[in-house]
Amino acid sequence: MAEKNDSRSSITSVAEKELGLLSRHLDVLKTVKEHGPIGIIRLSQMTGQPQHMIRYSLRTLEKGGAITPSPNGAVITDDVHETLGTLESTLDDFTVTVQDLKKKLK
């Protein structure tokens, strides 16, 4: 059984890591949307993520145009809905890709 898990992680580890990162970014974005303006310490407390991971997520979300810093903490931008729409479309594409990969296994 251990071989199976090792094999699984070596084949899919990058994808799993990136999906985990995406999940964290979405958790941070949702928290900013619901509680903003909000600072790093409070985000860390609310999400249970270390502050350095919160900083990275905030930088990524800011670069993507979903949030912006303010004197009182991070706030969502007017572009957040466009960002979420693009993300939803991309996840739909991922779903199709995953289904195609499953078909290749058969």
Q: For each predicted feature, which ranges?
A:
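Short alpha-helical segments that sit at the start of domains
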Residues: 2-27
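Amphipathic alpha-helical dimerization/coiled-coil segments
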Residues: 2-3, 85-106
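Short amphipathic alpha-helical interaction segments
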Residues: 48-62
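A short, conserved structural fragment
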Residues: 62-72
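Short His/Asp/Glu-rich catalytic/ion-coordination signatures at enzyme active sites or charged loops
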Residues: 82
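Residues within the helices of the helix-turn-helix
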Residues: 30, 40-41, 59, 72
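Short amphipathic alpha-helical interface segments
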Residues: 21-37, 45
